[in-house]
Amino acid sequence: MKYSEIKNSTNIFNKVGSDGNGTDEKYFEYLRSLCSVHPVETSRHKRYQDNDFECSPYVLWNNSLRLFNDDCDIYAIVYTSKDNESFKRVGIYIEQVFKYVEIRVNFIEKIIDYIDNYQ
């Protein structure tokens, strides 16, 4: 697989966002900002946001209670600046996250091979 194919892929998360230009990489960055890196500041990801301000103070496992009647593994509970809306849920599928990471880790081998062949 070529780097451009990895960079422009939408095959894992299938989330192109409101402008239609989203990619797996951009969606992963949005999830990462919500769930771990910048949970209070997600304004870089307008294509995936419903409002100007979003923050996710916590995530919940979608356990046996199936609180919201879908099959995702984890929910990012997202507070927004939208009037009359207490929160939104962003469903996260662990298998998709692992697949995304696996593809990028496997690409490291290609980089190493390229460097070895260059020398």
Regions found by a protein language model. Name each.
Residues 1-8:
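Short, contiguous, well-structured surface segments enriched in hydrophobic/aromatic residues
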Residues 10-119:
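Acidic, Ser/Thr/Gly/Pro-rich intrinsically disordered interaction regions
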